[in-house]
Amino acid sequence: WKIQLENTTDGYHFPMVHKSWMASVDSETADMMSFMEDPQAETHALGNGHSVGIMATAHVDLDEDDGTEEIQPRFNHLVEELEEAGESPERIRRYMRSMHGCGFNLNMFPNIAMSSAFFRVLIPISVDETEIWHMALGMDGGPECVNRERLRIHEHFQGPYGFGSPDDAEGWDRVQIGAGGNPDMPILINRGLNREYRTENENWPTSHVTDETGMREAYSMWKKMMSDD
C-alpha cells in the first residue's frame, strides 16, 4: 500500500508513466500538466504523514483568476449549453476552469488521497496486495452537463480501460517484483533533499513536486507509528 500512497504526490513519474495519457488529450490539457520545469509546482510536507503536491498552479484557488487563461476549446459545447441555460459568463468561466478538479494532489496518511477530481482509498489486503477504491468528485448542486463531463474525464484516466490507472498499476507490479528480488536492499527516497527548504510561515518541508518530500513525510510517520518509542 505504501507504493500507492507514494504515487499521489509524486510528480516525477507523471510525464513518463502517463505518456500515453498525455498523448491522448488535447494540447491545452497536456500543457496544464507540464509541471516538470515549473518552479511554483511544489510538494509540501504537512506533518503527521500528510503532504500536498501542487500540480496545476493556476487552479489551486479558483477565486484567483486574472482572466488570461483561455477556456479549452474541447469544452465549447458545454459553454454553449450553459449559455442556453442562462448561466452568467462569470459562472461559466469558473465551471470551465474547474473541469479537471483542483490543481493539487493531497495525501492524508495513511490511506486516503485526493487527486484533482477524485478520492482514492487504499485498503491493504496483504504485504503484496492492495485494494483501491476510486470515487469521482462532482459539483454539489452544479450543472448536470458539467458533472457528466467531469465523469467522462475521470473515466478517460481511471478504470481498467483508462489511459492512466492501468499504467500506474503496471508500474506498481514491477516495483513489487523488483523489491522482492532483494528484500534487504535499501530503497532511497532522497530525491530533492539538496533543494528542500521550509516555508516561512508554516515551516513545512518543501521541494519541487518531482521530489520525494511527500514520501519522506509519509515514511517518517509510518516509522514513528511502528516503533515502540
Language-model segment annotations:
Residues 1-229:
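C-terminal catalytic domain of Rieske-type non-heme iron oxygenases
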